[in-house]
Amino acid sequence: MNLCDKYTKLVVRTNADTPHDAEVARNFGAVGIGLCRTEHMFFENEKIKAMREMILSGTKEGREKALAKLLPYQKQDFYGILKAMDGHPVNVRLLDPPLHEFVPHDLAGQKTMAEEMGISVEEIQKRVNSLSEANPMLGHRGCRLGNTYPEITAMQTKAILGAAIQLKKEGFDPQPEIMVPLIGIVNEFDLQEQVIPVSYTHLTLPTKRIV
């Protein structure tokens, strides 16, 4: 491998969504992360609860309250991944899948969610059904989620760059990149580009735009 490294012009990044996977990949020679899928981080117990609260909330205030619960979890995940890849780029994809993938579709799960949120099962079912789509692969997902609910993009941006700043203060060299997913037309990107800088104006980390 040392001989290959001496002559190669090709570098290999990995796909990794956890600090452990990032560390393993680096030990095998990966020089960064080409795709870090943030949706995979939301399926642990407390995270999925907060995620579902955010999705099923009927108000912006309710979504922001749930996202405030998710923020420290996201920051912790990104901290571990960026630390494992110290000095190498980590390309983080903002939330991509349609929201119906995160909500309970079984009656038992819906009853539990109703109890946790203090609303009726019928209301939970109504909100879950409202998320169904004719073409979920190209519908309300990716950048369109971020444009409909910019508070999601804001939370993830704060988590990514907040983790990077913490590592900088500790003497590490984090190299975060943010991917805005599923852009169809430039207007969709423009809307997200308005949200992302506002989310880190209170932070002190040099950033650059790559399209």
List each model region and its residues.
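Conserved alpha/beta-domain cores
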Residues: N2-L205, R209
